[in-house]
Amino acid sequence: MKKILTIFFIFVSMAVYGSPEGKAYIGSFNALRLGESKKDYKELSNILILLDIIGLQEVSNREGVETLVDELEKNTNEKWDYHISPYPVGTKKYKEYYAYIWKKDKVNFIKPRGFYKDKGDKFIREPYGADFKIGEFDFTFVIIHAIYGKNKSVRIAEAMNLPKVYDYFQNLDEKENDIIIGGDFNLSVRSEGFSNLLNHEDKIINCISPAMKTTIGTKGYANQYDNIFISEIYTKEFTGRSGGIDTANGNYKKTRELISDHIPVFIEADTLKDDD
């Protein structure tokens, strides 16, 4: 039976910080050249404290992550930690790191899984994975920043290879079946590029509504590019609730300049049980 998604949009000024007891908010966020571009780290921390763990894309350097973690600790009086990929990936002209940040009292970092072995060079930036445990729920969290090009067919072609990414991380450990793939895919989930992934034998589903726009234009929200995918067979800890954080509150241009041109997206997971 298909899960019914409950989509909720968090407004930062009204939100209660943190997830309910026995639940966790697992998020993905394109941080727009974190560590390189001008950032309002205090406001960014006000946004991200709503989540328990966040997979970050577009990380320019370690210093940006450390500055963000420091600000989160000041803002919450809680300990935060991070993990950053050992090296950046991309092209000769532009490379970026992946990173994770999390609340130390709630999330346990188990180990890095490393980069997807992209033997056919199908991805401009190889996806990266790491293992975490929140309560009784352990999982592999894979993050990706897909190619963006004026030619949409290039983006579709890359997305068609996502099942290989899922299978790679799924097969690394026969005891760990919970694979969460989050990131900026630079395509709407309605695109044919996701047909292979969504027809996978493990019944992979998209957790973020196709109707929710996740990028920020100068005059409003624009595209549905950010998403989180799980297996409906294995990751029964997913409660069916997911959403995004309204980072702009109508201030689209300023948010693009000081925060990001994407919003964080997230899922809610039950942490009192583990079905592996």
Predicted features, each with a name:
Residues 1-4, 184:
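Positively charged n-region of N-terminal signal peptides that target proteins for export
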Residues 23-33, 111-113, 138-148:
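Active-site-proximal beta-strand elements of phosphoester/diester hydrolases
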Residues 60-137:
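Structured beta-strand-rich core segments of catalytic domains in phosphoester-bond hydrolases
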Residues 4-14:
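Sec-dependent N-terminal signal peptides
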Residues 16-20:
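Boundary at the C-terminal end of the N-terminal hydrophobic targeting segment
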Residues 62, 168-177, 187-276:
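Metal-dependent phosphoester-hydrolase catalytic domains
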Residues 28-39, 119, 147-154:
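Acidic/histidine-rich helix-loop elements
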Residues 24-31, 47-70, 101, 141, ...:
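Active-site beta-strand/loop signature of hydrolases that rely on acidic residues for catalysis
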